[in-house]
Amino acid sequence: NNVLPILKIHGSYENPESVVLTKGKIRELLFDKPHYNEILKRYFTENTILFYGYSFNDPDIDFILQEVMADNKGHTKKHYALLPDVGKIEAQYLLEEYNVQVISYKTEEKSHLAARKFLERIVKAL
């Protein structure tokens, strides 16, 4: 079956009650509810992840990724991140720090049309 799970860590506009934007709420989910934290760690350990709409500036998620790398002594599945306008240094950092291969795309006038087209090609390939 070609159904791939989509993890919306900060919630979804389709379900407004699920949206978590404050640092306090995020930390509550990740650290006060160990089950949630363990589910995320398991996903990051056992699956190849495509990050989309995530800039790697969230310290709490970064902490989980670092835990996964430490728990597995740096040997994890390779992940991918579809990110706008990423330079070589940042891409190398993400690869070495989190085993995340960057798929960079150019934005034009703050448009992310290139990312959307890339995702559409992935969906067609499934």
Give names to the regions the model predicted.
Residues 19-24:
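PP2C/PPM family metal-dependent serine/threonine protein phosphatase catalytic domain
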